[in-house]
Amino acid sequence: MKGLRLGVNIDHVATLRNARGVRYPDPVAAAAIAEQAGADGITIHLREDRRHITDRDVAMLKQTLNVPMNLEMAVTEEMLDIAIKTQPTYSCLVPEKRQELTTEGGLNVAGQLETITDATRRLSDAGIQVSLFIDADHEQIDAAKKAGAPIVELHTGQYAEAETEEQRTVELARLMEASEYAHSIGLQVNVGHGLHYHNTLEVAEIPQVCELNIGHSIIARAVLVGLDQAVRDMRNILDKAR
């Protein structure tokens, strides 16, 4: 069985920098450390309000990364233009509301199929591999397939936020079933959102999962143990799963 890919999201390095309006810590430096520690890719979310990652960060990372860039973005003309100009390896289309602290749910592909299909086609024509961040739901998985995206990233937030063991078991089973279904219709399965050092192993053990995108928990741990160690610790969890 292939090894799992770890995508390290460095958004919150930029959050820390922007909290004081200074130039440090530098997301570009953080990405280099994460690469050396075992990250298979670097994920960044260029939000419409630029609350953490900036256009300059995107441009600098494109020049310096030695691993694939996964650019998360809303489905807007501005973001499509930036992605096509930047040429990340992957572009993950996500829903976005300005008032939310973090992405709260999956993209409603079924409800805006024409728009998502058009965005997917434009990005694909530019040589960018498209993933759609969706809930673990058959309707959305089917819509992602119809839209022409080769990859889905299943939203693990409900699993991560489960307050009881029973609820967590139900959510894990839902992720397992959705992963199996998406894989069966020819989609690559990635997962992400809310994953940390105590809940990632079970998700990583789902056979169809290829990549986990994890950010906040790694950056939070980095404050205590350093970024290199924080990434290595998560890498070890993924390696244990396979």
Curated annotation (Swiss-Prot):
- What enzyme category does the UniProt record give? transferase
Q: Where is it chiefly localized?
A: cytoplasm
Pathway recorded for this protein: Cofactor biosynthesis; pyridoxine 5'-phosphate biosynthesis; pyridoxine 5'-phosphate from D-erythrose 4-phosphate: step 5/5
**Catalytic site:** H45 (proton acceptor), E72 (proton acceptor), H193 (proton donor)
**Where can this protein be found?**
Cytoplasm
Which Gene Ontology terms cover its molecular function? Answer: pyridoxine 5'-phosphate synthase activity
Residues that coordinate or bind 3-amino-2-oxopropyl phosphate:
N9, R20, G194, G215, H216
Is Cytoplasm there in the keyword field? yes
**Residues that bind 1-deoxy-D-xylulose 5-phosphate:** D11, H12, R47, H52, T102
Which Pfam families would you find in this protein's record? PdxJ
Q: Which InterPro entries match?
A: Aldolase_TIM, PyrdxlP_synth_PdxJ, Pyridoxine-5'_phos_synth
Presence of keyword Secreted: no
Which keywords are on file for this protein?
Answer: Cytoplasm, Pyridoxine biosynthesis, Transferase
- Tell me which EC number(s) this protein carries: 2.6.99.2
Catalyses:
3-amino-2-oxopropyl phosphate + 1-deoxy-D-xylulose 5-phosphate = pyridoxine 5'-phosphate + phosphate + 2 H2O + H(+)
Swiss-Prot/TrEMBL GO biological process terms: pyridoxine biosynthetic process
**GO (cellular component) term, any one:** cytosol
**Site positions (Transition state stabilizer):** E153
Could you tell me which SUPFAM superfamilies the record lists for this protein? Pyridoxine 5'-phosphate synthase (SSF63892)
> Subunit details for this protein?
Homooctamer; tetramer of dimers.
UniProt similarity note: Belongs to the PNP synthase family.
Write out the function statement from the record. Catalyzes the complicated ring closure reaction between the two acyclic compounds 1-deoxy-D-xylulose-5-phosphate (DXP) and 3-amino-2-oxopropyl phosphate (1-amino-acetone-3-phosphate or AAP) to form pyridoxine 5'-phosphate (PNP) and inorganic phosphate.
What protein is this chain from? Pyridoxine 5'-phosphate synthase
Q: Which gene encodes it?
A: pdxJ
